[in-house]
Curated annotation (Swiss-Prot):
It is an enzyme of class 3 (hydrolase). It catalyses: 7-[beta-D-apiofuranosyl-(1->6)-beta-D-glucopyranosyloxy]isoflavonoid + H2O = a 7-hydroxyisoflavonoid + beta-D-apiofuranosyl-(1->6)-D-glucose. GO terms for cellular component: chloroplast. This is Furcatin hydrolase. Expressed in young and mature leaves, but not in fruit and stem. Belongs to the glycosyl hydrolase 1 family.
């Protein structure tokens, strides 16, 4: 992930966003049917700790030294890795038997929706350069690499009946073997938004329940071909982002929304999310029943959430922050933990929110061995006291307004992605909240990163001291969360390489390795990569 679009009442996540409302406003009493809580566990600024080891000692003039402070902070076996995704990295979209995904179609048919008009046809050419990139990983010292499998490289028709593509299987087998030979654990995502265009054409993809069987068939091929070596599987990457940007505002593939050429922002996001959850449950059940005992791996899911800070200490704003968490994280994690959607969603969305059968709820509940959690920023959440009754949309259903500013002051320093302010304490607060709300799951931070914009030269790009500071601060607050009992087992940077960032194109850079688009996509280690190298003792 790693970009955002437009934010309205409930958060969106990935791709540059414009935020609703002004920078300041006084909360008013809600005239809706929801009653405010007498007390709330969500306090303004959500400062869960002060007398811990999170004070900043970062020195920009001696940035490398800060790695020493954290070098022995994490337990043995802790995974440190870099993240990637197939469409953002691989390129070679017409090679090796691969067929188009919805992102190929979207980027080519709607170049105006991509900031620089680019696409992922070449991306960073990982398909041809993966062996050299694995050498870079080993040089940096990471012991994990998160990547996704391209559905249409494995099943070009999207369906098992259309045949398995041996070239695609061979590519991922070679990548996995290369990683393991270099002491790097593969951490594999089965679906990272690149749905086969053929399935979108046939039955509208995840809008149809037919997707569950096709997705399960695809996942089973992955288990059969790669499961003897892959010990960490995630079924879905950020289903919230897929639903919000794909079906609420139309900024991502497949580009559907109420004001788009097709779509309904008040119904389709909920239907797509429901089918994503059912697909996850079917695949998790398949893996646990048929493959886990012999392959000895684990299966989870990757979710994303901002930390929601109440706009004021008014009880209505505290409750709004809780609703915002429900509508972003709880939308998916609540069914996976408790078998149903959060009560706030059931109350506010009503009959537009699909229901699980008793059997589906049983399949869903407890279906993850671990949770992948992506964190980028925090945001203020305020009660929306006067929702437009004619605007029926996911963005208004939560009755929350989100703000980056309070009294004209940003919640944290600005970054290269307008939607993401620098709020490192939020990673601790979100982790502690997840522990307490959702039964203390095993957690891997599967994405966390800083975007930089307007970086066009190697010399400028490699000197990313701000990114070093970003990771230093976030890892300190992550360490604090671990000391508070959160069961965190790993941390993956977003991203390993500067990549193609969805609707931001190549305009922003998240990598710890610089990609020179002016000189044949040459790779250069940034200061942040050298910092991690020292952190790992390499």
């Amino acid at each position: 992930m790693a970009t955002i679009t437009t934010l309205a009442s409930s958060v969106p996540l990935f791709r540059p966003y414009s935020f609703p409302g002004g920078s300041s406003r006084k909360p008013k009493k809600d005239n809706l049917s929801i009653k405010p809580p007498a007390t709330s566990s969500l306090k303004v600024n959500a400062k869960l700790a002060s007398a811990d080891d999170t004070s900043s000692n970062f020195n920009k003039d001696n940035w490398l030294a800060s790695a020493d402070e954290l070098s022995r902070s994490f337990p043995p076996g802790f995974l440190f890795g870099g993240g990637s995704a197939s469409y953002q990295y691989e390129g070679a979209v017409k090679e090796g038997g691969r067929t188009p995904s919805i992102w190929d179609t979207f980027a080519h048919e709607f170049p105006d929706k991509i900031a620089d008009g680019s696409n992922g046809d070449v991306a960073v050419d990982f398909y041809h350069r993966y062996k050299d990139d694995v050498k870079l990983m080993k040089k940096i010292g990471v012991n994990g690499f998160r990547f996704s499998i391209s559905w249409t490289r494995i099943l070009p028709s999207g369906k098992l009946c259309g045949g398995v593509n041996k070239e695609g299987v061979a590519f991922y087998n070679s990548l996995i073997n290369e990683l393991l030979a270099n002491g790097i654990e593969p951490f594999v995502t089965i679906f990272h938004w690149d749905l086969p265009q053929g399935l979108e054409n046939e039955y509208d993809g995840f809008l149809s329940g037919q997707i569950v069987n096709d997705y399960r068939d695809y996942a089973e091929v992955c288990f059969q071909e790669f499961g003897d070596r892959v010990k960490f599987w995630t079924t879905l990457n950020e289903p919230w982002t897929f639903c919000y940007n794909g079906y609420v505002n139309g900024s991502f593939a497949p580009g559907r929304c109420s004001t788009c050429t097709a779509g309904n922002s008040g119904t389709e996001p909920y239907l797509v999310a429901h089918n994503l959850l059912l697909s996850h449950a079917a695949v998790a059940q398949l893996y646990k029943n048929k493959y886990q005992a012999s392959q000895k791996g684990q299966i989870g899911i990757v979710l994303v959430c901002f930390w929601m800070v109440p706009y004021s200490d008014c009880p209505y704003d505290c409750e709004a922050a809780q609703r915002a968490l429900d509508f972003m994280l709880g939308w998916f994690l609540h069914p996976l933990t408790y078998g149903d959607y959060p009560e706030s969603m059931r109350h506010l969305v009503g009959e537009r929110l699909p229901q699980f059968t008793e059997m589906q709820a049983m399949m869903m509940k407890g279906s993850i061995d671990f949770l992948g959690l992506n964190y980028y920023t925090s945001i203020y959440a305020a009660n929306n006291e006067s929702p437009n009754p004619h605007d029926i949309s996911y963005t208004t259903d939560s009755r929350v307004n989100l703000f980056q500013k309070r009294d004209g002051i940003l919640i944290g320093p600005a970054t290269g992605t307008p939607a993401f302010c620098f709020c490192p304490e939020g990673i601790r607060d979100l982790l502690v909240y997840t522990k307490e709300k959702y039964n203390n799951p095993i957690i891997y931070i599967t994405e966390c990163g800083l975007a930089e914009a307007n970086i066009n030269t190697v010399d400028q790009g490699v000197k990313d001291v701000e990114r070093v500071e970003f990771y230093y601060e976030h890892l300190k607050f992550l360490r604090s969360a671990i000391k508070k009992g959160v069961n965190v087992k790993g941390f993956f940077t977003w991203s390993l390489l500067d990549d193609w960032e969805w609707n931001s194109g190549f305009n922003v850079r998240f990598g710890i390795v610089y990609i020179d688009h002016e000189d044949g996509l040459k790779r250069y280690l940034k200061y942040s990569a050298l910092w991690f190298k020292k952190l790992f003792g390499k």
